[in-house]
Amino acid sequence: MEEDKQYKVLLIGDSDVGKTSIVKRFSDDTFDEDLLCTIGVEFKMKEVKVDGKKVDLCIWDTAGQEKFRALISSYYRGAHGIILTYDVTKRESFDNLNYWLNEVENFANRSNLVKLLVGNKIDKENREVTREEGAEFAKKKAMLFIECSAKSKIGIQQAFEELAQKIIEIPQNTSSSQPKQRNTGSVKVEDEPDHNQGVCSC
């Protein structure tokens, strides 16, 4: 029987765009209006089915605050997928997307990295970024694109399933399996990450 595969997915983007809410909605089907900002990196394990196959995603939720950005850079290594997130009600978070893509270019170490652009908070009425703008940006950068709402659940499951589908379509990603890790955890940014530890080490 073929072993299940585990793939590392990193959520990046400005602070307060809803990265943690997206992860919690996907992994636990919960939503909290009063979530605190992520300090450092937190991760969750979640299984999805793609074409009848079980795919284990190790989802890393990163801090978006500027003071943590340099410390987070090392966590790009080994990622199979990137979810670049912005808030459709905050133009600045969309304008900063190129900064985050530069971070990916500088620190990610896979040439076949799958990138998904996600516009979050479409449940709100005060939209500042149109769907067309998001789709056009993603097209120019060769990214997948979806809009979603962690609050109303719209697009959340689809986003991760589409990303997982693209990841496993890459032959190099399915040639060997990664050891399964525990289901949740966090990493302090004060410390240099130890990549020999059993923390979702895909």
Curated annotation (Swiss-Prot):
Record flagged with keyword Lipoprotein: yes
S-geranylgeranyl cysteine-type lipidated residues: C200, C202
- As annotated in the record, motif Effector region runs over 35-43
**Gene Ontology biological-process entries:** intracellular protein transport; lipid droplet organization
EC numbers on record = 3.6.5.2
Disulphide bridges: none
Q: What class of enzyme is it?
A: hydrolase
UniProt KW Hydrolase keyword: yes
Under the heading Pfam families, the entry gives:
Ras
Q: For binding GTP, which residues are annotated in this chain's numbering?
A: S15, G18, K19, T20, S21, D32, T38, G64, K121, D123, A150
Q: Name one GO molecular function term.
A: GTP binding
Sites where Cysteine methyl ester occurs are at C202
Query: Where in the sequence does UniProt note compositional bias of the Polar residues kind?
Result: 171-186
Gene Ontology cellular component annotations, sorted alphabetically? endomembrane system; Golgi apparatus; lipid droplet; pathogen-containing vacuole
Disordered, as annotated region:
171-202
Q: Which reaction does it catalyse?
A: GTP + H2O = GDP + phosphate + H(+)
Q: Which InterPro entries match?
A: P-loop_NTPase, Rab, Small_GTP-bd, Small_GTPase
Q: Which SUPFAM superfamilies match?
A: P-loop containing nucleoside triphosphate hydrolases
Q: What CDD domains does the database record attribute to this sequence? A: Rab18
Q: What does this protein do?
A: The small GTPases Rab are key regulators of intracellular membrane trafficking, from the formation of transport vesicles to their fusion with membranes. Rabs cycle between an inactive GDP-bound form and an active GTP-bound form that is able to recruit to membranes different sets of downstream effectors directly responsible for vesicle formation, movement, tethering and fusion. Plays a role in apical endocytosis/recycling. May be implicated in transport between the plasma membrane and early endosomes.
Q: Name the family the entry cites.
A: Belongs to the small GTPase superfamily. Rab family.
Q: What is this protein called?
A: Ras-related protein Rab-18
